[in-house]
Design a protein with these regions (language model features):
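Walker A/P-loop
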Residues: 124-145
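Conserved Walker A/P-loop ATP-binding site and its immediately adjacent core
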Residues: 147-172, 462
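SF2 helicase catalytic motif II
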Residues: 205, 220-223, 238, 323-367
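Post-DEXD/H (motif II) to motif III coupling segment of the RecA-like Helicase ATP-binding lobe
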Residues: 346-407
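A conserved SF2-helicase RecA2
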Residues: 391-405, 549, 553-585
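Conserved interdomain hinge at the start of the Helicase C-terminal
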Residues: 422-460, 467
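Conserved helicase ATPase core of P-loop NTP-dependent helicases/translocases
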Residues: 476-514
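Conserved RecA-like helicase motor core of SF1/SF2 enzymes
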Residues: 516-555, 574
Length: 585
């Protein structure tokens, strides 16, 4: 009989799957296949063409017979299917309920599915909660915290825009002994953790703490030797020691060069001290003071360059020590947390996988997402870290229940069809610089604004936003990313919020880039125009979710607030690639 030994992060097969070595090897291969996924476009790989690779990546390590614990259910079902005798031994330590917090939703009642989600989270201990935009993930998360009652908790968010917003909402609803709690935060230059409570951390900050970084282009996590900065800590220490040495030498040289002035100052002080006549004493003291000022001025001039170099080196060293301290605090928090929860868990599966490995002590592992699937087949990585989907609440469910407004989706055909030798040329000619398409966007945007419908336009390229801003009356283009590579400053975040308020008041037509795809709280926006040509169903669901929120608790109140529905405008072109993208959306 084989034993499945379950731990928080990884599980292990102990014993033989079969006494016959050949059959045993075949069964291990079956486990490898069961815990694998097909790599898109693998058929173009040389190893695949040469028969050296089957085009799949497995999460099962055959050499040491381990796999992510979120996949135990798959292994158990496989063993039952193959009639392999097995037992499950759970060696995890369940944490004590050491953080009895409560929720104060300010008179609001949780919806039934939010209660169910929070109950299932505690019961299953790990899993994905598929809650669409508008389902109330923040309040659901707070109820989960109350049900689990453990600390510390790490709550991962994918972008800097969500960091303070999430912290603020948690502090708004959570109570300890009747008082509002202090929620820890790390990211965007902030690091104020609560080792005995709940903490919100960006995944970029969490990765940096372990000297890792995420490469979006290759969709992988790699070591980051320069995570602390372009210079190593040893190099900064050497520079500080050298600067200190040079400053000492400069001080000695200045003292030597100013020896005569120093002697004059010493004599002047001596004469002043000995003088008994008050009037003469005052005159001598004034002369001594002037000599002291002259001495200090000339000395500062002589050591100015070396002093500045020392201060610069000391500041760099102090900053590095602060960075190392903060990284250590984040590492300790993640390594010791009792609950590891990821918001927007679909964003980067390899990041979740890496951080899940580091959260070795996390008994509870949960993910929240409105779109818990990926275009690259890597959902199994998310499942391995966080577990299978335990509840699903779709936009259709909430529309039927009256918690979201119904969408009206229109696809506008564009007859202008321009060629191009490469895809960037095709995109530029048919999307960015397509006069017919852009003019129709202008007509739609201005018409909806005039009709009193706050309108959002989501572009994929900055140059496209610039063009549309110049064409559309009252349009304001607010560019920016969403991956945390170039985190917005507080001023930029405040500007975005002001522009969101302006579009909600129908003062402007807002044109935005991917920063507005997720985490934007602007329920009054009633119209969405999609001028780009993305082919990701995940992105499309996120974008459409921006305009489905009710203005108020339900559709009836939303109708009273002049938002009975949401209108989404998309475009269809006859160019082969772009037409395919539209069909996928």
């Amino acid at each position: 009989m084989v034993t499945i030994e379950v731990n928080n992060a990884t599980s292990k097969l102990i014993g033989y799957l079969h006494q016959d070595p050949a059959v045993n090897a075949q069964l291990h291969e079956a486990v490898r296949q069961e815990l694998s996924y097909e790599v898109p476009s693998a058929e173009w790989s040389q190893k695949y063409k040469q028969g050296q690779w089957d085009g799949r990546i497995s999460l099962y390590n055959k050499r040491i017979t381990t796999f992510p614990s979120g996949l135990v259910r798959r292994v158990r079902q496989l063993f039952e299917k193959l009639e392999i005798e097995h037992q499950i031994v759970d060696i995890r330590e369940k944490p004590e309920r050491n953080y009895p917090i409560t929720c104060d939703f300010e008179g609001k009642d949780l919806r039934f599915y939010q209660e169910n989600a929070a109950t299932l989270a505690k019961k299953t201990q790990r899993g994905m909660l598929s809650l669409c935009t508008g389902a109330g993930k923040t309040m659901t998360s707070c109820k989960i915290f109350e049900n689990l009652a453990v600390a510390p908790v790490v709550f991962i968010v994918p972008a800097i825009e969500l960091l303070k917003q999430t912290q603020k909402e948690f502090q708004r609803y959570l109570r300890f002994n009747g008082e509002k709690i202090e929620v820890g935060i790390a990211g965007g230059g902030l690091c104020k953790l609560n080792m005995e409570g709940i903490n919100v951390i960006t995944y970029q900050t969490a990765l940096i703490a372990f000297d890792k970084k995420y490469l979006e282009k290759g969709n992988k996590v790699v070591d980051d030797p320069n995570g602390d900065g372009p210079k190593s800590t040893a190099q900064l220490q050497k520079e500080l020691e050298e600067a200190n040495k040079n400053l000492i030498i400069a001080n000695n040289n200045a003292t030597r060069d100013l020896s005569k002035l120093s002697l004059d100052l010493e004599n002047a002080n001596m004469l002043s001290d000995k003088e008994t006549d008050l009037k003469k004493k005052k005159t001598l003291a004034s002369a001594a003071l002037n000599l002291e000022k002259q001495f200090n001025k000339e000395k500062n001039t002589l050591i100015k360059t070396d002093l500045a170099a020392y201060k610069k080196a000391l500041t760099a060293w102090d900053n590095r020590q602060e960075t190392l301290l903060q990284k250590s605090q984040v590492r300790n928090l993640i390594s010791s947390c009792n609950a590891f929860i990821v918001d927007e868990a679909h964003v980067a599966s390899v990041v979740i996988e890496e951080l899940g490995k580091q959260a070795k002590n996390a008994y509870y592992r949960l993910g929240l997402s409105g779109t818990p699937w990926r275009m690259d087949n890597q959902e199994i990585r998310i499942e391995g870290t966080l577990g299978r989907k335990i509840i699903e609440v779709s936009a259709s469910d909430l529309i039927e229940l009256g918690f979201l407004v119904p969408p009206k989706i229109f696809v506008c055909n564009v007859s202008e069809n321009n060629g191009g030798e490469t895809y960037p040329d095709i995109y530029s000619n048919n999307i960015v610089n397509n006069w017919e398409r852009n003019y129709r966007i202008k007509q739609f945007a201005e018409g909806f604004k005039e009709a009193g419908r706050p309108t959002l336009i989501l572009v994929e390229r900055r140059e496209h936003g610039d063009i549309l801003e110049g064409m559309i009356e009252d349009a304001v283009f607010v560019p920016g990313g969403d991956k945390g590579v170039d985190d917005p400053t507080d001023e930029e975040k405040n500007y975005r919020r002001r522009m969101l308020n302006a579009v909600e008041n129908n003062e402007i037509v807002l044109i935005a880039t991917q920063w507005a795809n997720v985490g934007v709280d602007a329920p009054k926006i009633a119209t969405l125009i999609l001028p780009g040509s993305n082919q990701s169903s995940v992105t499309t669901y996120q974008q459409v979710g921006r305009v489905l929120r009710c203005v108020g608790p339900n559709i009836e109140v939303s109708k009273q607030n002049n938002k009975p529905d949401a209108i989404i405008i998309d475009f269809m072109l006859e160019q082969k690639n772009l037409k395919s993208h539209c069909n996928m959306r």
